[in-house]
Amino acid sequence: MKKHSISYLLFSICCLLPNAIASAQSVTEKLKAIGMENIRYAETGECITVTFENNVYRSTYQGIGEAIDACLESNVNKSLQLVALENQIPQLCISLPDTLLNDYREEKISLMQVYAEMGISIDTDHAMKAVENAKEIENPSAWKVDVIVYPELFLKNNSLNKLYTYAVNLSPAIEMGLWKGGKLTAQVVFPIAAN
């Protein structure tokens, strides 16, 4: 009797463990596919915690929205905690319960209802403790160089003989993440037009 129960236990562990790992990895693969960086994940009980950093989308909130959409497309059957990073420092913790994920997949609720019912908090300590022992950072941003062009428009109304003084500039910049919280930026300003 003991042999059968031990073999049944080992069989169930061998069958369920790869599915749990595969579901967490499907989230990280989806996040990597949309260009997120500094991805780490950990599974604790009924929750998968994933950290990510948005360096692709200009708006932080658009990047978070794209990450949530990508996670909704994955085959996760547990609750999700997403931690949004900025320069490798945690900023937001987004909680997506498994019931919310299942209702969205079964088309019982819309994407707007998911956004309305998910939990958002600036308290990231509990989530970061869950991933502090994660193996490695996937798609790290350290020492990667980003080239960005910033357009600039200045309007000033401080003289009596002209209605406005203006300047139009292009400012290309090279940005590189160095370490947690550290970033190097080099920028040159090219004037295009001015009066």
Regions from the PLM with identified roles:
Residues 47-77, 81, 85-93, 124-195:
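Transmembrane beta-barrel domains of bacterial outer-membrane proteins
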Residues 22-24:
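Boundary at the C-terminal end of the N-terminal hydrophobic targeting segment
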Residues 8-19:
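Bacterial N-terminal signal peptides
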Residues 84, 89-129:
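Flexible, glycine-rich linker and terminal segments associated
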Residues 28-51:
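Short edge beta-strands and adjacent turn/loop segments
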Residues 1-9:
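Bacterial N-terminal signal peptides that target proteins for export
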